[in-house]
Amino acid sequence: GFGSLFKFLAKKVAK
């Protein structure tokens, strides 16, 4: 779902 994708991107940009 889109929610999962958003969470994935959030983790990627999280530093």
From Swiss-Prot:
Superkingdom as given in the UniProt entry: Eukaryota
GO molecular function annotations of the record: toxin activity
Protein location: Secreted
Keywords, ordered alphabetically: Secreted, Toxin
Known tissue expression: Expressed by the venom gland.
Secreted listed as a keyword: yes
Any Gene Ontology biological process: defense response to bacterium
InterPro entries noted in UniProt: Cupiennin
Main location: secreted
Keyword flag Transmembrane helix: no
Pfam family for this entry, one: Cu
GO CC aspect terms: extracellular region
Family: Belongs to the cationic peptide 04 (cupiennin) family. 08 subfamily.
UniProt name for this protein: Short cationic peptide-1e
Organism in which the protein naturally occurs: Cupiennius salei (American wandering spider)
